[in-house]
């Protein structure tokens, strides 16, 4: 299955659970992409209770594709949080996936 998870919130627990699901799907050999959008691009800074940074790194190590909206990153002056992308890529991911989840 091709799964797309869009994280559009910087709420650490939401992002943490999204990456937990993405990791589970990757473990089951699904083709998984996570796209950070809106304030979701800020979630990788979290190293607190939910430590989104670590769980996102685990996702990448499993071969998951992690992308962030370049406009969202630039407007927050975050630098390189992960590979930068755009809405054209998000559109393609949505069009090609079997399931899309927005959190």
Question: What are the roles of these predicted feature ranges?
Answer:
Residues 1-6, 24-28:
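Long, hydrophobic N-terminal alpha-helical segment
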Residues 20, 48-54, 83-86:
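Charged helix-capping and loop-helix junction motifs
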Residues 74-103:
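C-terminal structural segments of small proteins and small subunits
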Residues 29, 63, 97-98:
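Short, well-ordered alpha-helix to beta-strand connector turns
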Residues 32-38, 66-70:
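Short internal beta-strands
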Residues 3-16, 41-47:
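Short, glycine-rich nucleotide/cofactor-binding loops
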Residues 14-28:
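Histidine-anchored nucleotide/phosphate-binding helix
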Residues 49-75:
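A glycine-rich helix N-cap at a beta->alpha junction
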């Amino acid at each position: 299955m091709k799964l797309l998870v869009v994280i559009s919130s910087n709420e650490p627990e939401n992002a943490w659970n999204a990456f937990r699901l993405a990791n589970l799907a990757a473990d089951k050999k699904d083709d998984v992409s996570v796209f950070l959008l809106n304030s979701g691009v800020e979630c990788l800074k979290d190293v607190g209770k939910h430590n989104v940074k670590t769980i996102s790194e685990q996702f990448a190590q499993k071969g998951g594709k992690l992308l962030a909206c370049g406009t969202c990153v630039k407007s927050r002056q975050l630098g390189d949080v992960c590979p930068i992308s755009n809405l054209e890529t998000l559109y393609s991911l949505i069009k090609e996936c079997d399931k899309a989840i927005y959190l």
